[in-house]
Amino acid sequence: MTILSAITSISRPNKISKSVVSSNGGASLSMGSNSVACGGCGGGSSVLIAAGGSGGLFVGAAVAVDLSIHASVGIAIGSTSCHCN
């Protein structure tokens, strides 16, 4: 399945972060060096938001190609969280 992904990074200019996007029935995304990957959400999409180690905040979203977006995003500062749409 084709996945459209949009990644927004709000951080210091010299902050470099790696991101991983994978698809297994649903879409999942992991951001930040100290974050853990979210599992699939049964055909939906999952969002992981993590606060970077140097003070940067990273927000990632993976959306299925049908563009039926259900915006349900939470923000966790100082920890990580997973949300299923």
Swiss-Prot record:
Organism: Dictyostelium discoideum
Official protein name in the record: HssA/B-like protein 62
InterPro entries referenced in this protein's UniProt entry, alphabetically: HssA/B-like_chaperone, HssA/B-related
Pfam families membership: Coiled
Gene Ontology annotations of biological process type: sorocarp development
UniProt similarity note: Belongs to the hssA/B family.
